[in-house]
Amino acid sequence: MKSAYRVAVKCLVDLERVEEVAGCSDSSRMTQIWKSIWSIQCPSKVKHFLWRASRNILPTKQCLMCRKIIMEDCCDFCGESESSGHILWSCTIAKETWKEVGINCSILSQTPTEFLDVWFMNNTKGENDWELFATVAWCLWNNRNKVWHGEARKNGKSIAEEARKYWAEV
C-alpha cells in the first residue's frame, strides 16, 4: 500500500513539473533551453527525444503505469522503478554507458531525477559535448525501447560505441 501511495505522489509531482515547465516556456531560461535543444547539430529524432525528455513526457513505465496502461513499472535491466531519470542516469546500464563514453557530467554522480536538472547543471558544455551527450541519451532510450519490444539488450560498452558511431556520422 505504501508503494502505491509513493507512485501516486510521484505521478502528481511529475505532472506538476510538466505543467510548470510548459507554463514557463516563455521565460528567458526556458527559451534558452528550447533554443539550445533545437540548435544542436543532430538528427530530428534526437532533438524530438530531447524535447520530450526535457518536458518529462517520455513514455516510461512509471508514466504508463500512472495512466493505467501497464501494471508494473520495473526496469527491464535492473528491476527498479523505470522513470526517465532512472533510464538515463541511475540504471546500472546507464551508469556503465556514461562511464564508457567518458563525458564528464558532474551531476551524474549525484543521481539526478530530471533531464532538465542535467541540462541546467551542465549548460556550459561545448557544442560537441552537447551533441555527444544528446546522442548518448537518445541511444540509452533507444536501447530501452528495443529491449521492451523483444530485442536483445546491449551492455554499456555497446551502447557507448553505437552512440559514438552515430554521432560521428552526423
Regions found by a protein language model. Give the residues of each.
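A helix-boundary/hinge signal
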Residues: 1-170
